[in-house]
Amino acid sequence: MKKKELSIFDKDILKEASINSIKKLNPVELLRNPVMLSVEIGSTITTFDFFYDLATNNNHAWFSANVSLWLWLTVLFSNFAESIAESRGKARAKSLREAKSNLFAKKLKNKNDKTYEKIPASSLQKGDLFLLEKDDIIPIDGELIEGVLLVNESAVTGESAPVIRESGTDKSSVTAGTKVVSGSAVAVASVNPGETFIDKMISLVEGAKRRKTPNEIALEILIISLTIVFLVVVINFRALSYYSVYSTNKGSVVSLVVLVALFVCLAPTTIAALLPAIGIAGMDRLFKKNIIALSGRAIEAAGDANVLFLDKTGTITYGDRQAYKLIPVEGVSEEELAMVAHMASIGDTTAEGKSIYAFTKAKYNLSIDLKDYKVIEFDASTRISGVDTKNEHYRKGSSDAIEKYVSSFGGSIPKNLDKIVEEVAKEGGTPLVVAKDNRIYGVVYLKDIIKPGIKKKFRELRRAGIKTVMITGDNPLTAATIAAEAGVDDFLAQAKPEDKLRHIKKYQEEGYMVAMTGDGTNDAPALAQADVAVAMNSGTQAAKDAANIIDLDNDPSKLIEVVGIGKEILITRGAITTFSIANDISKYFVIVPAAVSKSYPELNILNILHLANPYIAILSAVIFNAIVIPMLIPLALKGVKYRPMDAQTLLVRNLSIYGIGGILFPFFGIWIVYWICEIFWRVL
């Protein structure tokens, strides 16, 4: 179960965004967006010009009125784009607030005395102890120091299946607003009121603490610089117009309204209008995937990451060893081994035991109905499990444990057993030896199954220039086998925390951007060093503090998804910027010939659309410049889909679509608007 999708066309969101877009007309609000502030100033100038034309009975008052209207709409559409992104965030924040409202805590004086004082959750401070029991709503983020809980985290993650939280493990962290399904535990508050994970999520999705990323700042500097350049051009254009008219005694001075229209159409208003929405929508897109980015820098770094450190278990493999093959010893048939392995796994509740039972039943058509038997559960000291019937003893376990067991009954060890065990281990499997009474029958090859499609995914990442490194505690032989089968570029075997840290530093020194996942306290140093650090929400507080991205689903494979979303955000920003700047070329060929047609009729050669009425031509460009903003809002919010490919191919593809398309589309759009306006004016 995932979070409820919020439609772009949700009635409540559209209503709130419309109201906020009007409120944002306040010049103080627009100081954050200098380009749109300059458009608002231009709108004010043309509005005053309209009233002046009315007062002086100027025949072109209709032109001033329409240009003013569409310039104001340009600012409103820009505000609407940002407001709709913010409103989606506020809607999500509202549901999060409901998860933490009216919470109480059972405060303890010490963990040995379970007598508690019931206080408001807001009174708990970092370091305070509190009791958690069945049906309690967890009042504050904390770490279990005693006990085990089954917790429903759907209020935060959207996942209805409860999860286990246990003290002394890497899954000891509990989150405010989640509910205890069963169990009892003592926890220590790991944060102060207002600093909980839900509080951070609320701030982030509302955009209250969203800082501009380095790429956003660089892009803002670019579009502000372009705006200043075009402003200087327009001012000089006015001076040139004066000089031309008075020196040649022909034509007329370009009006203030035309100059403002020229400035607004040439300035990069499209990207300036949509840039805030792209940033906010990026956070929202991650949130829909149950991923919380604690900073905008983390998202950008994810988009630039070119080395992924991936945990083998959970990311590349399922983590549950499953029966893959039966290998009998000399003198034993495969069917005989299957029968003994099947019997030894009856009643076994472990994942491996269930796998062997299902495998032998399906492949060898075994179905045995035992009534009088005793299950011998796995014991860490003996490393053996099995079944005892009235007359027979079936066992399975590690090779040395089974050899010892068989020898105790006076049995012998098959000559080729060691070779079979060694070959299975070399291939990355786990050899489980099977015996009946004093005889060894063979080996069950247990394999940590590689997730389907993972090799294709790694191949796509490689094509996009991203290197994958598998992290595992397995021995080098096993690690090499799994790495080859999965298709990763490199692996780190028998990895200790200090090994991870050393390898991350090594790649960073070579100029790579490194991304990794982790959930334990021992992962914290490496997470802190990585450029993109994804911590599991179930992990320890130390791991979450060191990370800059939190995965609420506790799925290590999400790292690949995080990188993909990061690239989508960067590509979206680049695509709309390219489209916006390319638009200026088309609008130049419409407005400039129209503006100087009387003074310089020779420049009509630039009027490639052959628009006869210069006033309607300029108005058409202004209208198109305004309506393209709401047309691109869905793209800004949903993003340009990322397809794994090398940087050169991606650049050529996006330049073709958004560069060439950005030049051609306005010609077509302005031409359509022109003829609609022409027909409308003829009817009037």
Curated annotation (Swiss-Prot):
Active-site residues, as the UniProt record annotates them: 311 (4-aspartylphosphate intermediate)
Cellular localization per UniProt: Cell inner membrane
* Gene Ontology cellular-component terms listed: plasma membrane
Q: Which UniProt keywords apply?
A: ATP-binding, Cell inner membrane, Cell membrane, Ion transport, Magnesium, Membrane, Metal-binding, Nucleotide-binding, Phosphoprotein, Potassium, Potassium transport, Translocase, Transmembrane, Transmembrane helix, Transport
Indicate which residues the UniProt annotation says bind ATP: 348, 352, 378-385, 396
Read off the InterPro entries from this record: ATPase_P-typ_cyto_dom_N (IPR023299), ATPase_P-typ_P_site (IPR018303), ATPase_P-typ_TM_dom_sf (IPR023298), ATPase_P-typ_transduc_dom_A_sf (IPR008250), HAD-like_sf (IPR036412), HAD_sf (IPR023214), P-type_ATPase_bsu_IA (IPR006391), P_typ_ATPase (IPR001757)
- Please list every transmembrane segment annotated in the UniProt record, as residue ranges: 61-81, 217-237, 256-276, 616-636, 657-677
**What PROSITE patterns does the record tag this protein with?**
ATPASE_E1_E2
Query: How would you describe this protein's topology in the membrane?
Result: Multi-pass membrane protein
Provide the binding site for Mg(2+): 519, 523
Q: Cross-referenced PANTHER family, in alphabetical order? A: POTASSIUM-TRANSPORTING ATPASE ATP-BINDING SUBUNIT
The name on file for this protein is Potassium-transporting ATPase ATP-binding subunit
Task: Identify the species of origin.
Answer: Hydrogenobaculum sp. (strain Y04AAS1)
